[in-house]
Regions:
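PAPS-dependent sulfotransferases, especially Golgi type II membrane carbohydrate sulfotransferases
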Residues: 106, 147-148, 166, 174-239
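Glycine-rich phosphate-binding loop used to anchor ATP phosphates in small-molecule kinases
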Residues: 48-74
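PAPS-dependent sulfotransferase catalytic domain
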Residues: 65-183, 197, 201-203
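Short, structurally constrained coil/turn elements
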Residues: 3, 54-55, 82, 149
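A generic structural motif
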Residues: 5-8, 59, 82-86
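PAPS-dependent sulfotransferase catalytic core
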Residues: 1-48, 54, 191-196, 205
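CE4/NodB-like, metal-dependent polysaccharide N-deacetylase domain
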Residues: 46-56, 139-147
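Broad structural signal for hydrophobic residues in well-ordered alpha-helices, predominantly aliphatic
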Residues: 1, 51, 78-79, 172, ...
Length: 239
């Protein structure tokens, strides 16, 4: 989507975390000692506007699990503080595909973060990745809630995107009610937005590196290497 100069599809975004951390200040003694909800809410109301104030693009696709629910979750906070309608693009990929991709990555890149945690084997690493407060669990929670709010969501199946990317991208433009931009689907660029790129030294080399030649799903042999107990527990999560 970033080939279109009018659109920015962000890297993994911190905006939802900003809003949640501001909300959690309400649990601190210093706030409860002088509970000025209105003033703090004023800041929460403009998190997105301030964060993206200097971005030149017309449309920002903010990548984060906005539909996660809780007490409150991201979805509840957004409904209160964003103050305008918003749409969600939801990517669906079978969980075993996701875990196999992680296995391939951390096996081929010794500095990958699961290898830094004194975890003994693949089963321990995958269980760590699937912990309740981890990124995968948050995304699954968001997807579950997305199906309850399908009127505001557009669902993109990973297999469809990698089989006919142009068709799926056109559907996204229709959902956004924006004119189609002629994208190229070969000779792809690594993600770079407003001059910034991922620093994968933080999480492990190549975590966000894409294959540049073309968009195509390739068989991942690590599917056969996923431990049996992981398959038994999570293998039913398919889209």
């Amino acid at each position: 989507m970033n080939q279109n100069p009018e659109i920015a599809c962000t890297a993994n975004s911190i905006t939802l975390e900003l809003m949640k951390e501001l909300y959690l200040l309400k649990e601190e003694e210093v706030f409860q000692n002088f509970p000025d909800h209105k003033s703090l809410n004023n800041i929460m109301d403009v998190v997105y506007d301030l964060y993206y104030k200097d971005w030149p693009q017309k449309i920002i696709i903010d990548r984060g699990p906005v539909l996660t629910t809780g007490n409150p979750g991201n979805f509840e906070l957004m409904k209160i503080h964003y103050k305008r309608p918003f749409k969600c693009i939801v990517l669906l990929r079978d969980l075993m595909d996701v875990l196999a991709s992680y296995m391939k990555w951390y096996t081929e890149n010794p500095d990958a973060f699961p290898n830094r945690l004194n975890l003994k084997n693949d089963e321990e690493k995958l269980r760590y990745l699937m912990q309740n407060d981890g990124g995968i669990a948050k995304e699954l929670n968001a997807i579950e809630n997305a199906f309850k709010h399908s009127d505001m969501c557009h669902f993109v199946k990973y297999d469809d995107l990698t089989t006919d990317p142009e068709k799926e991208i056109k559907k996204i433009y229709t959902f956004l009610e924006e004119p189609y931009f002629n994208h190229r689907f070969i000779d792809l660029d690594q993600i770079k937005i407003n001059g910034l790129e991922y620093n994968d030294g933080i999480v492990g080399k190549n975590m966000h590196t894409i294959k540049r030649n073309e968009i195509k799903k390739e068989y991942n042999s690590y599917l056969e290497k996923i431990p049996k107990r992981i398959k038994e527990k999570y293998g039913h999560i398919r889209f």
